A protein has these predicted regions:
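Intrinsically disordered, low-complexity polar/charged tails and linkers
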Residues: 1-145, 151-153, 159-212
């Protein structure tokens, strides 16, 4: 059975394909913050969906805080509408194009872990409890980083697609606790039992045929 997970943060990039006047946007839209002496981009905070967006002068946008790709699309569409009201050269995006750059999720192995033993067993695990209470597992394929905790909880980062997240969690689970053996069903057990009971009967029949 696949490991259950919860997406807690999805980061994506997009482009509004227009030059933005960040000063003008910050003055006109209440939920935009712009402090160029501290950071070159403006910050747009949406309440629904609850997503934060970095806006840059060249029209590039970085979204974070979403829990699904649907929320990313909704946020970019909503942002383009807000900005279009102030700067008409920015088109309202009906079809939203974006690239997922990072996907962060939590999962649970539902068993306690011996992190010292895990670090000894696996070369790609780092564990320095005096610096951080969790162990760091790095997977090459797919390229993901996981934080492992003693209570079996994990935080996974680095996936760019949900399919890669699922694959990475499966790989991590098999590395840490091993592959689970397939359970034998009641029907299979009955077949095995029937097969073993038939063999002696056939042997008796052959013996009976040979005897005078």
């Amino acid at each position: 059975m696949p490991l259950k997970y919860t997406i807690v943060n999805l980061v994506a990039s997009s482009n509004l394909n227009a030059t933005l006047d960040l000063y003008n946007l910050a003055v006109s839209i209440p939920n935009i913050e712009y402090e160029p002496e501290q950071f070159p981009g403006a910050i747009l905070k949406l309440k629904e969906p609850k997503v934060s967006m970095l806006l840059f002068k060249n029209g590039k946008v970085i979204c974070s805080g979403a829990s699904s790709e649907k929320q990313i699309a909704q946020a970019i569409r909503k942002a383009s509408k807000l900005i279009h009201e102030v700067q008409k050269q920015v088109k309202v995006q009906k079809t939203v194009h974006y690239n997922v750059v990072n996907l962060v999720a939590t999962a649970n192995l539902n068993q306690n872990l011996d992190l010292f033993q895990t670090a000894m067993k696996l070369d790609n695990v780092e564990y320095e409890p005096e610096q951080f209470p969790g162990a760091i597992l790095r997977i090459a394929d797919p390229k993901l980083t996981l934080l492992l905790f003693k209570n079996g909880k994990m935080i996974c980062a680095g996936a760019k697609r949900e399919s890669l997240l699922k694959k990475g969690l499966k790989v991590a689970s098999e590395l840490i606790i091993g592959k689970k053996k397939k359970k034998t069903s009641s029907a299979d057990k009955a077949k095995e039992k029937a097969g073993t009971s038939e063999k002696p009967a056939k042997t008796r029949e052959k013996t009976a045929e040979k005897s005078p």
